[in-house]
């Protein structure tokens, strides 16, 4: 599952990446790859194709991209109609707008990659501080009906240990 999420994220950036190594740090998956970056992911509490991921790139290891995926039983042709569109979401109690980056074919339909934005690692850690679990609720599409594309509108992740995993990922990134 993680390899699929990694592949999806990499293809979204149109960057050829080859895994150089990986390990687990207290239930957090950490991988590093080429071009030089470090990935941290948390498995969903709810769905198989819904990891919450963080990617840090060499050269600016203090900023990370946050992303997730949602499964859909809709065809890839239909999902492609909402690529680069925006969704209003509730992420950890904060209302914000995120972007649908891309859709990918899956044996059961499609996988939708959602970009939750770029944040400093310290801001991410502060946002997750004292939380054991975080949820993402899709509120509404801008110019489209979510129900026509998404099978579910929410997901959650256990984020215990994520701050230490991000610290470890930052150290790895700085040593790339």
Annotate each predicted stretch with a short phrase.
Residues 17-176:
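A generic "folded-domain core" signal
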